[in-house]
Amino acid sequence: MAALKEWAVVCKALEEGRQILLLRKGGIMEYRQGFKVKHNKFLLFPTFEHQSKESIQPNYLSMLYSVIQNTPTNGKNKITSYAEVADIKEVSDKSILRKLEKYHIWNDRYIDIRMNYNSKRPMSIILLRVYKMDNPIEVDVKSEWAGCTSWIPIEFPVHSNNDGRQPVLEDRRFNQIVDEIKEVLN
């Protein structure tokens, strides 16, 4: 099963239904081709590198501090959520991203940094349907997973029919937010 590496604070915001989108450009290892959504279903692998209070909106600072206090120290990581891609859009206009600020945790400064990185590539906006796993899994962190790469393989079967996972937002609320975001993007 594929897993997408994402800041732990973002994983927490996704799990709490406080955001349903990701803004991705790609890391150093993906510079030439930019970020690609290689999988429509994947685990969310929380990372603890690079996330900082200088990059997020002030109302998410307490969430960041909570996540930092729970940073794994034993060479293991806990995966507690799973996502399915609902839609993908590419955006090159910073003003559109500013209109989406209530749907994600990043601040304007960080969005500017990400937009300016590999400036010929657009920002990918990935709308996600996120599921909280009833039985989180603990994995040994492998050295080959280190660094700025987005996708990693994790041996874990994902069952069909939402077995063992619950959507973090009920259908009506999720669809309402998707419609609001799509209105901004169109």
Regions found by a protein language model. Give the residues of each.
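Structured alpha/beta reader/binder surfaces that contact nucleic acids or chromatin modification marks
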Residues: 1-186
